[in-house]
Amino acid sequence: MLPFIVKLHIRNTSLGDLSWLPESMNRRADFFLYGKNVVLFVIAVIMILNIIDRILIRNEKAGNVKYLLPLCGYGITVILSTIFSKSKDVALRGMIEQYEGMWILLAYVIVAIYSYIIVQSEKDMECICMTMLTAGILQSVFGIAEILGGEILSTSLFRNIIVGQQYKELAGHMVFGFMGESYQRVSGTLYNSNYAGIYFAMILLLGIFLFVKWDGKKRIYAAVASVLSLICLIGSGSKSAILCMLAVMIWCAAEALFRKQRKQVLYLLAASAVIGCGYFIYDSVFGVHTIQRITESLDLQEKTDKLTDIRVLKDHISIIWDGETYALCMEKEGKSLYPHVFAKDGSELELVSDEKRQICWPETMEGQDIYLQCYYKDGVPYMAVFHNDIRWLFTDVVDDRYTYINIWGKPDEVISAPSVGFKGKEHWFTDRGYIWSRTIPLLKNKILVGSGPDTFMLQFPQNDYVARAAQGYGFFSEIITKPHCMYLQIAVQTGVLSLVFFLCLPIGSGIKYRRNRYRNLKKDGEKQKDHTYVDGIECLIIFYLLTGITNDSMVVLAPLYWVLLGVFMKNVKPALDKVRPVF
């Protein structure tokens, strides 16, 4: 139910007061996250009451609670990070474009504990798997409609439901879709095409697993869910989803070979062939060029920009261009303004003018994509430096010194943020190299506790303008709201210690499960038995953790992971009446 919730919520943020944000950020609309946030919190409260009823009233066993200790440790670090946060309101309620405040992170913990306690049998796990397939099929209806050029959420019925009575006048002006794309990407009700891709890849992996395990009508159901999920996965255009899914399938094939399960290897090879054909056909029909998009994002060549530094000083602007330092200033003569450029030794550079475009440039920088312009606007003198389709605007009327005016028209400081690694490689993985290199230095003061849940945007050096400009105008004008890495997200916001607890959960459970499994194999004379649904759940957990390298935790997907993690930690061992190998 949770992934399907879409509801308009308009929030007053007061963020527009920050120098690096536009005034429009004071009031923001949300459709896909806040509603899910509220419903998840209500579900978590119901789960707590159910747990109390089962354990304290009915005296049911909760299982070995020692396996929940890392989970409790994670929850404690979340609470402590909120208590010590400088932005407590954000840490409690969450930030726009994320809405993962303390209450939601604790709700994830409750979801995992509930799954750990409640799931008792193979029948329970079959119910979870069947529910996931059904949800995947329903979600694919939205996705296939988008591929065919429609948008279910944009129909008048859904628009009126989404906005409600309070904002009904907005219903006729709403259109859902991705702007600036050459083709319609699938996102469904999952906020973003990347998260939609991850979701459909999880359903596809589960469908392949269940197709091998199930018989009869249930096998057909798994096949239908797999095919529909594959179509929507391809339509999402998510690069990380397909790459991580292929990595998991290779891992499964290697393990099947190790266990001498040739039949499972053939199933995986057949599934890989179908996936490959699906991408080839889709690319041919829609001209998407998936392979090209993947290789472009994996372009590992170093890239550098000639403009590497800007310092705004009292009486001039200092820039480093192609390794050389220059001083820029403007001279006022009556109603006219004249730019001047000086070399490091104090000599003035000759300027070449283009009267038609009213720009000029140093003669020694002819054809190097750097131009100067001075002008008055509303009586205020400005000097603009143009490079790489970006305008750097300066004035000298603020506090009687030179000041940078950012693209939002606000005076701001230009800083050079500390970085670790990725020098010349900031463009790697769709500019994630830059974000990661500026995020890692933030960790040194966040070992025990972090800055608070959902406060990454307030911690990131948003005014590291020069380094961002080197990645192009699109990235330069973007507000960095998340690190695009779940592990950095956790470490910054709730502390490195919380990341250790977070990783202890799947890694510790995985080691325990594999140790028990191979011990049983040895006892049975290396005869492979059906390991029920736990193998499939393990694959989904590994897949989700892999996608976390380049994606963040989001309320649209995270609850599903925590459900699976709780089940996996319980490591259910039902009676095995049927022997049927599963990869």
Stretch-by-stretch model annotation:
Residues H9-L21, I152-G164, G450, F460:
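Interfacial/capping segments of alpha-helical transmembrane domains
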Residues M1-K7, K36-D53, K66, P70-K88, ...:
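Alpha-helical transmembrane segments of multi-pass inner-membrane proteins
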Residues L92-M102:
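Non-cytosolic membrane-interface motifs at loop->transmembrane helix junctions
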Residues E350, E355-H427, L442:
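Long, low-complexity, polar/charged, intrinsically disordered or flexibly structured peripheral segments
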Residues S14-L33, V90-A91, G172-T189, Y434, ...:
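Juxtamembrane membrane-water interface segments that cap and precede transmembrane helices
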Residues E151, N192, G323-T325, C329-E331, ...:
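TM-adjacent membrane-interface loops and short helices in multi-pass inner/ER membrane proteins
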